[in-house]
Amino acid sequence: MVWDATNIFLFAANILTVLYILYNDAVIPLWKGKTVLSVKLRSRGRWDGYIFVGIIVLLFVSNTFFREGPFSTSVLLGIMGVLFIYICFFRSSKAVFKESGLFYALLFFPYAKIERMNLSEDGVLVIETNRQRLMLFARSEKDLEKMLAVFTTYS
């Protein structure tokens, strides 16, 4: 394996991507106590995923067939493509509700720090903390009712 700057960057990006997947799918459900509710949210930015995976595929094809680049770079690009296909198309964003707060976008927000909540007409639950605004795009009205029930019970 050739350890040039490109391969080091691709290797580090693949390791960080695997750590992200493990944290999101294995650590968050077990961390900060028992999971009260886990709700899958509507996906936003699906086209961003198509574009990003398309760029990785173009880099892979260019490196492998047209440039005849190092095999190790092709392998690392292939691994990155598989990881991002999983992230963009098979994994869905979710909000994980615990007894003391919720995980959203990899961060934990305690219920005590929530200042106000608003519900829009199109099913978006807007949660305002002292520093930021969270927008939870519920997939269905039942999911929205479940989220509101958890908020009324635990906050």
Swiss-Prot record:
InterPro entries: DUF986. It is found in: Cell membrane. Coiled coil: none annotated. Keywords: Cell membrane, Membrane, Transmembrane, Transmembrane helix. GO terms for cellular component: plasma membrane. It comes from the Bacteria. Signal peptide: none annotated. The chain crosses the membrane at residues 8-28, 46-66, 70-90. Pfam families: DUF986 (PF06173). It is a multi-pass membrane protein. Belongs to the UPF0266 family. NCBIfam families: PRK02913.1 (NF002791). This is UPF0266 membrane protein lmo0779. It comes from Listeria monocytogenes serovar 1/2a (strain ATCC BAA-679 / EGD-e).
